[in-house]
Amino acid sequence: MSGFPSDLLAGERYAVCGLGRNGTAVVQALLGMGAEVQAWDDRNADLPAQPNLTVAPLTDLSGMTALILSPGIPHLLPKAHPVADLARAQGIQILSDAEILYRAVRKSGSKAAFIAVTGTNGKSTTTALIAHLFTTAGRPCAAGGNLGTASLALPLLPDDGVYVIEMSSYMLERLDRFHANAACLLNLTPDHLDRHGDMAGYAAAKAHVFDNMGPDDLAVIGMDDDWCRAIASQVASRGVQVVELDADALPPYDGPALPGRHNAQNVGAALTIASHLGLDEAAIRTGLKSFPGLEHRLQKVAECDGVSFINDSKATNAEAVSKALAAYDKVMWIAGGVAKAGGIESLAPFFRHIAQAFLIGQDADVLAATLETHGVPFQQCGTLEKAVPAAFKAALDENIPVVLLSPACASFDQFRSFEDRGSHFLQICDNIVKSGHSGTNPTQKQED
């Protein structure tokens, strides 16, 4: 049960465009709060008939409270969806479901705290860790947004509750009154530039996470790039409390679920925010020790004959892969898919961690050209099914302790998503373990 009053949004009308996982959840939540909804999806507009729901093309938005676009639908760049142009022409706000959640919580009378987490990399881990800290401490807590559950599908929390919302740049562009009691910007490196025009546009979108904050609120900002440093200065000038995190100055966290120096920054951000919102040191320490980590993010999925298999399928850009490579002395590296702008040239300082690369996907040649320039040995494997056994054999032959899937590329050439890619990797590793090698599958207990 959502806990929101069934008449909370009575008299309000919403247009919802995009009926994937997020959009469908938004429709159900709005209907559950008494709103009228007109919904449409250009590809699949199949929803069961319900009171107050109209499934029809969005050709007239007159009288609508707002248009809620699914995150993947552009409202400006690279080309605005026609319904976004229509909304602007008719003076209708374009909002994210996180904005509607905030309004619904406050309209319900709850004073629950809001935490917003963003950044190019690390935001899912940090979001999950913050939520884990509050949950293990016994505080009512709900986490979602870009991670897992759609924001508007989260339940109503009491006054001492905490919402932890992972915010993508797409969501942040569509906020209005949303006011975080604590917000975190971990880092900024080029990503989604087709949606934001350039790096300045991307940074401006991310900076919205600090909108509406005041002197009692906390902004935690990573200081490892010029964009974040500039935003920190701007936020501090408004009187908001700013805590600056320098990854190189933080002591590394050695917990098995959070390997690598980059996770020290994620941990630092989570601990700072948890403390600001009332958790004591003992509760934080207890939660930190029991945090299991996230799937597809430096996740150890198997160990065979002394070789660890690490699933980092979420690492779809070079910046994320740099953190993974830095976490290990030497690896057999599996990479490839649909290359991102800039390729992997920026990984050159980390190539010393690669004993050999095993390339897959449509842009394997692009990665191969860079590796060849820098003298990094590689094999063209084409698929994960060929790459994983080849990397394992090479690891045994060369006494390398880690096979790392950290693709530096998008997955949609061969897989439905990065999760699908990671799951395929896990299955292949599991087959290797079952083939007679002396190995273990650390994920097995979670699945049983």
From Swiss-Prot:
Single GO MF annotation: UDP-N-acetylmuramoylalanine-D-glutamate ligase activity
Query: Major place of localization?
Result: cytoplasm
Q: Give the highest taxon in the source lineage.
A: Bacteria
User: What subcellular compartments does it reside in?
Assistant: Cytoplasm
Q: Name one GO cellular component term.
A: cytoplasm
Q: Which Gene3D superfamilies match?
A: Mur ligase, C-terminal domain (3.90.190.20), Mur-like, catalytic domain (3.40.1190.10), NAD(P)-binding Rossmann-like Domain (3.40.50.720)
What biological-process GO terms show up in the record? cell division; cell wall organization; peptidoglycan biosynthetic process; regulation of cell shape
Q: Which UniProt keywords apply?
A: ATP-binding, Cell cycle, Cell division, Cell shape, Cell wall biogenesis/degradation, Cytoplasm, Ligase, Nucleotide-binding, Peptidoglycan synthesis
Q: Which reaction does it catalyse?
A: UDP-N-acetyl-alpha-D-muramoyl-L-alanine + D-glutamate + ATP = UDP-N-acetyl-alpha-D-muramoyl-L-alanyl-D-glutamate + ADP + phosphate + H(+)
Regions crossing the membrane: none
Where ATP is bound, by residue? Answer: 119-125
- Give the pathway: Cell wall biogenesis; peptidoglycan biosynthesis
EC number, UniProt record: 6.3.2.9
InterPro entries xrefs: Mur-like_cat_sf, Mur_ligase_C, Mur_ligase_C_dom_sf, Mur_ligase_cen, MurD
Q: Which family does it belong to?
A: Belongs to the MurCDEF family.
Protein name, please? Answer: UDP-N-acetylmuramoylalanine--D-glutamate ligase
In its UniProt entry, the species of origin is given as: Gluconobacter oxydans (strain 621H)
